[in-house]
Amino acid sequence: MILPTTYMGSVEWYRLFLADPSAVQIEVMESFPKQTYRNRCTITVPHDSQSYCQSSIANSLTLTVPVKRADSKQLTRDVEISYQQRWQHQHWIALVSAYKRTPYFDYYADFFRPFYEQETRFLVDFNEKIHEVIVRLMANNVAIGNGLWAIGENRTADWQGLNLEPCFGIGQSILDLLFEYGPETPLALCRMG
């Protein structure tokens, strides 16, 4: 299966990826299409003091990694990130604001902070590094692949009791699930399918 590179990919993207990671290839030789999830993500932002999943009112916020001017024939692998704006600071503040009340933000924040303090030249490299962190955090205790989600050595995942709130919309970043469910994120992905 061929998937595009993504900036903190969507829940749907990770469901496809985690179904069989060994069968996935990330497309980097295509002409770079503008206004896609290759350099943007959508996160959920609460309006009140509750966790975003418990909030009665929540909005989506799109975060875009600015890229240096790319022409229509430039390959995705050659697209460079622009640092003329303070987008890293803005993205980090948005992530903190959106997720600071979630159960797992304090545990996982330090894994993501370096991406907003250091510069990476190419978008593909930046996306790949974030993807590796996300997969490592999700797969820490879970063997993933071939449709089997097993926890530990001898027990199959049981997601029957997992209460998924109706707050995870189409196109929302996997971070919505990761910061809310932590190590149970793969179970939440199964339940959504």
Language-model features, listed with the residues they occupy:
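Residues lining hydrophobic/aromatic ligand-binding pockets adjacent to catalytic sites
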Residues: 1-193
